[in-house]
Regions:
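Cyclophilin-like peptidyl-prolyl cis-trans isomerases
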Residues: 2-177
Length: 177
């Protein structure tokens, strides 16, 4: 009788642990399925998709999303390309001097400037960014901590390398991925 009772207790213990492990696995799967918002820049050469860093640059991320959602970037050209360094866009004047009509406070952070890093372009004044952004073509560690890094290309880095001065951002959208 004692052996039967021990087997019963062991069986209940084992069953409880298996159920807990299964439920834990389901919770973990749901966490892994968590979606993120991305920016999709559509060009004739293909799409550039980048994820945001809202914890490192919350106001900058919000500003970019706001501009994209109201169609600000649609039809703008990439006005700058420095081989082996960056491509730059987001200027409605198309010459590097334009913006949305306001500036935002810098959110300098220590996110490294790697290939595909997306950051805000600005003048010499730290709080002069508005809508212009650049995407690194190669690592640029000398920029670290001096510019607001707010994203990283996750798809389309080949497209980034094909962008030339005058290429158009046909449409920029914010999507869930």
């Amino acid at each position: 009788m004692r052996k039967i009772a021990m087997l019963l207790v062991f069986g209940i213990f084992l069953t409880t642990n298996l159920i807990s492990a299964e439920e834990g696995g389901k919770v973990e799967s749901k966490a892994q399925e968590k979606t993120m918002e991305v920016a999709v820049i559509q060009t004739k050469k293909g799409n550039i998709i980048f994820k945001f860093f809202p914890d490192d640059a919350p106001n900058t991320v919000d500003n970019f999303k706001k501009l994209a959602n109201k169609g600000f970037y649609n039809g703008l050209k990439f006005h700058r390309r420095e081989p082996g360094f960056v491509i730059q866009g987001g200027d409605p004047k198309g010459n590097g001097t334009g913006g949305p009509g306001y500036t935002i406070k810098a959110e300098f952070n220590m996110k490294p400037h790697l290939e595909g890093t997306v950051a805000m372009a600005r003048s010499n004044a730290p709080d002069s960014a508005g809508s212009q952004f650049y995407i690194c073509l190669a690592p640029a560690p000398f920029l670290d901590g001096q510019y607001t890094v707010f994203g990283q290309v996750i798809e389309g880095i080949d497209v980034v390398h094909k962008i030339a001065v005058g290429d158009v951002m046909e449409k920029v959208t914010i999507e869930k991925k």
